[in-house]
Amino acid sequence: MAFNKWKTGGRLKLEWRYVICPLAFLIVLWVAASFTGHWATEENPYRSYALQACAWLDGRLDLGKDYPWLELAIYEGKYYVSFPPFPSLVLLPFAAVWGANTPDHWISLGFSIIGIIYAIRLYRAITGTYEMAEQYVLFLFLGNGYLFIALQGGWVWYMAQTMCFTFSLMSLFHAANKHIGRAFAYLACAFGCRPMVVAYIPLILMLGTEKASVKTWIRKGYRLIPACMIIGFYLMLNAARFDNPFEFGHTHLPEFVRSTEGQFSLNYATKNFNQLFRLPQTGGEHGMLIYDTYDCMAFWLIDPIIVSFMVTWLYALTRKRKACGLNLIIVPATICVHLMIVCCHKTMGGYQFGNRYIVDMLPYVFYGLITYKQGVGKAEWLNNPLFALGFSINLIGTVSTYNHWI
């Protein structure tokens, strides 16, 4: 809970981490915005979800016309938003008030703050303490590639990722507390933003139903109804738009229609996997390194929390920690499945700084990290230099990329 009782007097006090962590995050975003001019108040040119919400309010599924600068699916001569639809559901009440000019950046910023709060709650649920929570949570949000998407969270690609990130943390928190219905409902919301998180169904199932009997499953099965309704909405919407309940629209993007391999192919895997190890090149002006801004680069530079996760997992594995149980297998297995799906995609995120497709994995990496660590004070020594690396590279890289300095 966010409130604790004073040791004397029985009064309530606010757990300070719920204030300090969002404040630190906002300060960093303010600094980045002050160098780039990308404030939350600026107009959003990539407002695909707002346009879709307005179309729904007008009683139509397609957008009515082409917007050449947006990634639209073209099917039977009509133009559709090609991304999974859940963010448009969130924007419906805002579109009813503001039309297509919804406050997208503010909405995504709000989701980031909610995500920070749930990351703290998840840490408390797993470790049983708030001690060191601020270090792990700020490592997750500021020391990795999330910073790049958070600065322009209203853009269509980043709004979906911001919401998916938060819904993933919410799903993990409720699964850790055995609220299986809410856990799968939030995972269904995350799936409606970034479908690749379907890989984590086994993890949420294991975490949320640990030690549950078949009789308990039968008695509480109704709790899965909200998740089933959300998935049912996706299936019906897809069928109504593309005559295929499993098609969100990306297959009908011109770039994938023209591709002989399509959107997903095993033929992409080797090339994309190798890009996860791509280092900055030498030979820049005045001795500077040359950082790539298309697809991705070395994951340990952009998302060093993964390095901490891997080291801590190996530590837990060699110690044969019974307390970790199936987490030693299911967490890395589901992350590897997610990674394989990502590598089989035609692109690795296009123009960006870092590895934005890998960002979707980080809530689950965070869960694994705090699950494996051998008590407070045992694993934290590695996080400080890794946080320094990730924070400095991502902050400078984010500012440089948005300013087109690199």
Task: Outline where the language-model segments fall.
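Membrane-proximal envelope and lipid/glycan-remodeling enzymes
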Residues: 1-406
